Curated annotation (Swiss-Prot):
GO terms for biological process: cell adhesion; cellular response to heat; cellular response to osmotic stress; cellular response to oxidative stress; plasma membrane organization. The modification Phosphoserine is found at residues 21, 24, 59, 73, 97. Signal peptide: none annotated. The keyword Ligase does not apply. It comes from Saccharomyces cerevisiae (strain ATCC 204508 / S288c) (Baker's yeast). It holds the Pfam family HSP9_HSP12. The gene is HSP12. The keyword Phosphoprotein applies. Present with 4490 molecules/cell in log phase SD medium. GO terms for molecular function: lipid binding; protein folding chaperone. GO terms for cellular component: cytoplasm; cytosol; endosome; nucleus; plasma membrane. Keywords: Phosphoprotein, Stress response. May play a role in a switch from carbohydrate utilizing metabolism to fatty acid utilizing metabolism. Residues 1-82 are annotated as: Disordered. This is 12 kDa heat shock protein.
Length: 109
């Protein structure tokens, strides 16, 4: 599930699986526009308001953008992605642990 106003993971997956050669110009244009809109939404949405997977995706996108701009090595990119994923997974574990132990849902405070 994706955050409100963000491109869903199912939509991203189906777009990635279908080769561009099999897409109409309208489909390619729609993908381009929705990808750019999702990227902007990811940059303006605060990190603490993102779901786990949306946060990981945005961190990966940021790493990709940085790598393209600075020529980072693949190892550096992988390290960045792993750091972001670990951070978000840690947040998820803390959330689940708190809920199991009866703490109030922090997203509803």
């Amino acid at each position: 599930m994706s955050d409100a106003g963000r491109k869903g993971f199912g939509e991203k997956a189906s777009e990635a699986l279908k080769p561009d050669s099999q897409k109409s110009y309208a489909e390619q244009g729609k993908e381009y526009i929705t990808d750019k809109a999702d990227k902007v939404a990811g940059k303006v949405q605060p990190e603490d308001n993102k779901g786990v997977f949306q946060g990981v995706h945005d961190s990966a996108e940021k790493g990709k953008d940085n790598a393209e701009g600075q020529g980072e090595s693949l190892a550096d990119q992988a390290r960045d992605y792993m750091g972001a994923a670990k951070s978000k997974l840690n947040d998820a574990v803390e959330y689940v642990s708190g809920r199991v132990h009866g703490e109030e849902d922090p997203t509803k405070k």
